[in-house]
């Protein structure tokens, strides 16, 4: 029987730590389910990228890392903000899996409580390989490209991701209000 693992992250953006973790996950199982957390969120400072943009980053980064020889699934997971049932919710949203890979102690606890095998994968340079640090560097105009796969840096440039993050950081209040205003569809 095929052994399938689950790995959940927000990927805001995909960085070298994610890819190192996924290399470990891919080495342990036959197939990988990659859950994209906070799937409903985008265009905020904490979650600047859309789910489809994060999927594209993952596809490109996994190809660049030559991790496409095994089957993987990208599954959007909107937030439910209810920790007690979160693991059950995830189980209902993804294909069957045998083992959970995580570096997050809460995620590990929630899946263990549901009877799943959990492997706490090694963390890779968490001090700088964090999406929060990468977004901070983008806002401050500091070098960030070496912290993400080359293909991800190229994609972020293609979609003007740095400009988006800087706009969100400098115009946080006004941009949040603008983004929450109803979109007017022209009448024909």
UniProtKB/Swiss-Prot annotation:
EC nos: 2.7.7.1
Keywords: ATP-binding, Cytoplasm, NAD, Nucleotide-binding, Nucleotidyltransferase, Pyridine nucleotide biosynthesis, Transferase
UniProt subcellular location: Cytoplasm
Superkingdom of source: Archaea
Pathway: Cofactor biosynthesis; NAD(+) biosynthesis; NAD(+) from nicotinamide D-ribonucleotide: step 1/1
Cellular component terms per the entry's GO annotation: cytoplasm
Catalytic reaction equation(s): beta-nicotinamide D-ribonucleotide + ATP + H(+) = diphosphate + NAD(+)
InterPro entries given in the database record: Cyt_trans-like, NMN_Atrans_arc, Rossmann-like_a/b/a_fold
GO terms of biological process kind: NAD biosynthetic process
GO molecular function: ATP binding; nicotinamide-nucleotide adenylyltransferase activity
Family: Belongs to the archaeal NMN adenylyltransferase family.
Record protein name field: Nicotinamide-nucleotide adenylyltransferase
Native species: Thermococcus kodakarensis (strain ATCC BAA-918 / JCM 12380 / KOD1)
